[in-house]
Amino acid sequence: MKITAQIKEPIREEMELFEQKFRSSMSSKVALLNRITYYIVNRKGKQMRPMFVFLVAKMVSGGKMSERTYRGASVIELIHTATLVHDDVVDDSNKRRGFFSINALWKNKIAVLVGDYLLSKGLLLSIDNGDFDLLRIISVAVREMSEGELLQIEKARRLDIVEEVYYEIIRQKTATLIAACCAMGACSVQPEQTEEIEKMRLFGEYIGMAFQIKDDLFDYTEDAIGKPTGIDIKEQKMTLPLIYVLNTCSEEEKQWLINSVKKYNKDKKRVKEVIEFVKNHKGLEYATTKMKEFQQKALNILDEFPTSPYKEALTLMVNYVIDRKI
């Protein structure tokens, strides 16, 4: 059994029911909208976000779930899908997970309106059912994701950023959404357990941090499926291995690195030289150590809960983040 199927196994029935509920939450009286949302639903990824919601909900409650849990997972998916549709417009991207993006097929104007529609559907799903605590969790996440993107744009102009700024960017851009999924799962079944909700939010944040550092490492190795090496350097993205080396090498080497990324980022030979330089100066070892620290912090939180199929699945999920090839 594939690792993702193993993770999904304890919540297989819930995931099947969620699919039906999620489809109906997208429905509209406008035929064009239905056609586009049908296209979106049929090209979904691994569905890690709702899996986090359900597994956490069941782990903290001893196997219980409620309609609130399904609504929470739907709200996360609706609002996150809205942000992805808008992202593709902003990035002028024609592909999403190997398929044509909404803006590629229906142009930017329709893509922006579809994103707005999905956002409003997510908001109304919470408001109509009085799930204001769940709505607050995802709203904070969307705010932080926007701030993280803008912080990255602001700092990208200066390539010599410090490690603390890098962590804040990836916390907001990547980790905050996984943190919201985990907090949402806990809050949907035990809304009064504020300490436990915060604990699960932190658990998700640690996984998200490890996930992004793993993504950074893919840029320097041939391990990744579907991500060519050096792509982050070509796009002038600051990754942890590069930041570490920039902060530990000599001033002359630092200037060469910054110059390479700023002016020669499209030169294949120079990009290869940068990759080798980062490897030789222990950038990958340092990033791997940091990634494993976040992994361990997440596992330490899981250790506080009694053994259950849901805890085991979440442990698998944490380790999958580190061991994945894509």
Short names for language-model regions:
Residues 1-326:
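All-alpha prenyltransferase/terpene-synthase fold signal
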